[in-house]
């Protein structure tokens, strides 16, 4: 028996791994921040911890090069300002794509990054 396909609020399919297509990029071969493609890329959920699954379903994730933009000192896990900038950008895009107000975003993701 086949599993029923799940879809997010935009009608985009959610894969078996829990991810919908990113709404931030359609280029999964290059780092979202630096544009390089010659390095290992990680899938980074913009809003982690309690909001990780929502980020996956809503398409709020980006590919990042592992050593520099994801885990490095200047990356989102080593640089709080870089992480805030990415969260702000993702919030703006989510509000535009889903038609959410700032309050609706806050209700879904716990706070506003604007």
Where in the sequence are the language-model features?
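Short, surface-exposed beta-edge/turn micro-motifs
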Residues: 28-29, 60-62
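A boundary/linker detector
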Residues: 1-40, 85-114
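Short linker/helix segments within small regulatory modules
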Residues: 47-61
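Alpha-helical and His/Cys-centered functional microenvironments
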Residues: 6, 48-49, 74, 81
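Short hydrophobic beta-strand that contains or immediately precedes a catalytic carboxylate
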Residues: 43
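Short Cys/His-centered divalent metal-binding micro-motifs
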Residues: 38, 61-87
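Residue-level detector of alpha-helix boundaries and kinks
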Residues: 16-19, 50, 79
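Pocket-edge structural micro-motifs
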Residues: 35, 50, 66
């Amino acid at each position: 028996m086949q599993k029923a396909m799940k879809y997010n609020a935009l009608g985009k399919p959610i894969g078996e791994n829990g991810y919908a297509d990113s709404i931030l990029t359609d280029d999964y071969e290059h780092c979202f921040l630096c544009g390089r493609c010659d390095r290992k890329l990680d899938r980074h959920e913009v809003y982690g911890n309690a909001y990780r699954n929502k980020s996956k379903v809503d398409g709020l994730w980006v590919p990042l090069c592992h050593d520099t933009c994801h885990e490095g000192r200047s990356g989102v896990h080593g640089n709080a300002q870089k992480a805030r900038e990415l969260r702000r950008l993702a919030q703006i895009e989510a509000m535009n794509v889903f038609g959410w107000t700032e309050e609706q975003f806050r209700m879904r993701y716990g706070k506003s990054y604007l």
